[in-house]
Structures are given as structure tokens and as C-alpha cells.
Amino acid sequence: TFLGAHLVPPGADADEYLDEVVGPMLDAVKDHVNWIDVFCERGAFNEEQSRRVLEAGKQAGLGVRVHGNQLGEGPGVKLAVEMGAASVDHVNYLSDEDIKVLAESETVATLLPACDLSTREDLAPGRKLIDAGATVAIASNLNPGTSFTSSMNFCVTTAVLQQRLTLDEAIEAATTGGAKALRRHNVGDGKDPQGRPAKGTLVPGAAADLHILDAE
């Protein structure tokens, strides 16, 4: 994933920086990545700027993703759905309309509980999303600035204890939900459209891509 549009470098103009992102940067990486991403958030990139990034990525043949609604309600979720994004990550602050839009779309809402705890933001409303019918994934968002663990066990446990998911829901979000966020189509019936073993579930014919824990 190419996330060149994460934050504006200190001292730079946002639009001038995006000229670089959608120009020489994208040209340099487009043959080496599958996705383009943008942080659509106050203090980062606004709706118009984010749309510019995603449209450039689409024109380059990339799938699109969005980071958004981490610090407050904003246009990130609706933009993600409008642009056909595979996922929108963070989703801490959602209006009822945001939840409805997600539930009616194929865009996966990715919960990042370790990041939420590290940044002391309100945890994303996983229970409301699932109850509304949205597809949910869980990820670690491991990075040195805002999420300090790679432990999916911790993330799943946090989703259960603090975001009110059932254990089954949390495990499904961390496996099948993640596969759907990667647009691994036909999850669960053995093969993807290219005939490769499906990911994200334990069924006959699926790829044995799994993590077995000796734990109680």
C-alpha cells in the first residue's frame, strides 16, 4: 500500500506536497504496490485533497483505501464508500449516517483497538457497526508513533472486553474480515476468482494460512 498522503511534511504546502504524491512518487511506486491510501482527517488532508489522491491511484490501476474519522467525525467514511474503497481504517467517530452508509456498502470498517488505546482516543463503535450490518475487520496498525504492539491476540481481546464484540465476532473480524478488507473474494468457498486458495477462514480447500496458539 502506498500511503504517501499521510501527513503534510513540516513547512510544506499541502497541495504542493500532493503534486509530488500523485506525480513522481506515484509514478515510482505504482508498479510495486496494489493499493493507494490517504489520511482524510483534520490536520492531514481534507475531502477534496483526499479525493485527488484516490482518483490518481485509481487511474494508475490501484485499489483504494482510506484512513479516516480517527480524531472526529468527518468526510472520510463517506468518501471511502463513494470511491469504492476496500476499507476505511480507524472509524472512531461515526455519525448514524456514517454507520448506515458503511452497512450498505462493501467497504470494510477496520477497528484498530491498540492504536485507540495508545492515542487515548475513544474506541471505535464496533458493536454498533456489526449490529447495523457493516463488515468489520480488526488490525494492529503497528507503527512506532501510534500503535505499539503487533499482537493480534491483544487486539482481539480488547475488541471483546472494551468494544463489546463477542469472541466469535472478534475472531471473524480478525480473519475473514481482514481477508475481505484485502478484497480476497469468495472467502470461505475455497478459491478466489484467479483460482487461488481462499484466505481468512478454515474450510476445506482454503489456504492453510493460520496461526495456532498453545493457550487456554
Residue ranges with predicted function:
Residues 205-208:
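Loop/turn positions that initiate beta-strands
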Residues 35-38, 87-90, 210:
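Well-ordered beta-strand positions
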Residues 63-64, 73-198, 213-214:
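Active-site-adjacent C-terminal substructures of enzyme catalytic domains
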Residues 1-75:
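Metal-coordinating catalytic core of metallo-dependent amide/deamination hydrolases
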